[in-house]
Amino acid sequence: MKSKQIVISILAVLFVSPLMGTFAQQAASSGSIEVITTFDYPGTGNQTLPQKINERGDVVGEYIDSSGVARGFVRFSDGSFSDPIVDPNDNVGFTEGRGINNSRSVAGDYAISDGTLHSFFWSGGTFTEYDVPSTVQTNLLSINDAGDFTGAFDPDGSGIFQAFVSIDGTLTSWSVPGAGSTFAYEINNSNELVVGYYLDGAVLHGYYRDVNGVLHFPIDPSGSVATVLFGLNDKNWVVGRYASAGVTHGLFFLPPSNFFTFDYPGSTFTSLNGINDRGIICGRYVASGIAHGFLARVRGTPPTQPMAPGMMPNKAPSLVAPLNPSPAEWGDAMPAR
């Protein structure tokens, strides 16, 4: 699929409502999310899964080819793509680009033949391997402009991950009380918030960790059966997705309790994965079983008043979440993409 920037700009003028999602529960004038363009990593049949975006507008992510091989990529702000990013130790065809900062330093992970995940930093074509010391698996998920980074690690090979953040070289880990695995997906430049998700049995819930180290959970829109918080910016605008009644919606979250929904037109699966300080969002939608990347922008000012009752945080136990419904949607792997 080629870039649709010109087409979408025209359609936005002719048919505003299909391409602009107004923040739920608020007046239309208060703010909206507007699609800018769509994109796919070059090649036939590739699933394109954007993950994070920097202030330049560079997007890091991964693509999955028709044989199921996953490789990382960077889509630069001019619309060009990097060569496939493949960690030299990846011997099973699984390398992911997960985070990118304004210096274009990339954080990601890869798998090896014993099924374990390991991580890397990539800058200027050079790989630097990284594993949390004395652990079996490490999953890097973001890097900020100071070089601080987040992710998760499995200390003993059990497959149960603990979230962590490394700030100024000091690593701090945590788990949501009572949870299985906990993942830390991004930290902003002010180190005010870390966002992510955790597993409660087979159910996914969002959470955030504030500057004082306090965990706030569960972060679930009412009716959600699976919530993931993927990215945030220095304004503490958070993006992610949630599933409800067989549809996966893009999620815009303003702490502590405001949720707003965005659905790509005509798709039953939308994921918002990264957002920069200019309000540019990267994410994906699924059409005919194929995942496509898109860029969108926040228009106007996101509302800050409390939500209507139908969108308050879900404090009741969630229903059973659908497990990996398709490679296009979940990437057929955990941690979520």
Indicate residue ranges for each PLM-predicted region.
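Bacterial N-terminal signal peptides that target proteins for export
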Residues: 1-10
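Bacterial N-terminal signal peptides
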Residues: 9-18
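Residue-level hotspots at or immediately adjacent to binding/recognition sites across diverse folds
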Residues: 21-337
